[in-house]
Amino acid sequence: MKKTKMINSDMSRVIAQMGHFDKLSIGDAGMPVPMGIEKIDLAVDNGIPSFMQVLTNVLEELEVQRIYLAEEIKTENPKMLENIKALMPETPITFMPHSDMKQDLNNCHAFVRTGEMTPYSNIILESGVVF
């Protein structure tokens, strides 16, 4: 059995296959995922698992050099923005319109669906390198 915190086999595989500048998205239960993009559906109930639980777990495994968030999170979900910044205080953030973020999912290796039910709880993680 794996010793690390990430025990979901699909998430482990996707993260292991990622290289520098590759992207992975984590989002709320309502985010539409483009056809052809792998969706790893973890949602089991309202808020289970939460966006922050999944993000925290992924950050145990993935080196992240930049994150992308919807511009709307600033006004529509400032608490979630505060939580993300607290978890990743040194990581640069690029804000974009939510409509552009949905289009950018086409450039992600996978989308991880959580049980989160709060608006604009979506992130794109850009992979860094560990050396």
UniProtKB/Swiss-Prot annotation:
Disulfide bonds: none annotated. Its EC number is 5.4.99.62. GO terms for cellular component: cytosol. Pfam families: RbsD_FucU. The active site is at H20 (proton donor). The keyword Transcription regulation does not apply. InterPro entries: D-ribose_pyranase, RbsD-like_sf, RbsD_FucU. This is D-ribose pyranase. It comes from Pediococcus pentosaceus (strain ATCC 25745 / CCUG 21536 / LMG 10740 / 183-1w). The gene is rbsD.
